[in-house]
């Protein structure tokens, strides 16, 4: 079983640079307070690290 993380969007993407909006879209997040369970890979961790002010990691499983 692969390790997973649960990511929650805590701030809006409105009036943010296009790069940050694209990262949110890549994570599957598009509205505030939505959560996604994602595979814990270096690429996902890198995406989360680019927008720490917009998302938070709620839980790490595995």
From Swiss-Prot:
| Keyword Ribosomal protein tagged | yes
**A GO molecular-function term, please?**
structural constituent of ribosome
Q: Which Gene3D superfamilies is this protein grouped with?
A: Ribosomal protein L30, ferredoxin-like fold domain (3.30.1390.20)
Give the record's GO CC terms. cytosolic large ribosomal subunit
Tell me one Pfam family matched here.
Answer: Ribosomal_L30
List, in alphabetical order, the GO biological process terms annotated in this UniProt record: translation
What are the alphabetically sorted keywords of the record? Answer: Ribonucleoprotein, Ribosomal protein
Q: Where are the transmembrane segments?
A: none
Q: What InterPro entries does the record tag this protein with?
A: Ribo_uL30_ferredoxin-like_sf, Ribosomal_uL30_bac-type, Ribosomal_uL30_ferredoxin-like
- Determine if Ribonucleoprotein is one of this entry's keywords: yes
Q: What does the similarity note say?
A: Belongs to the universal ribosomal protein uL30 family.
Check the record and name the PANTHER family matching this protein.
LARGE RIBOSOMAL SUBUNIT PROTEIN UL30M, MITOCHONDRIAL RIBOSOMAL PROTEIN L30
Output the NCBIfam families linked to this UniProt entry: rpmD_bact
- Could you describe the subunit structure of this protein? Part of the 50S ribosomal subunit.
Name the record gives this protein: Large ribosomal subunit protein uL30
Organism phylogeny: Bacteria, Pseudomonadati, Pseudomonadota, Alphaproteobacteria, Rhodobacterales
Q: Which gene encodes it?
A: rpmD
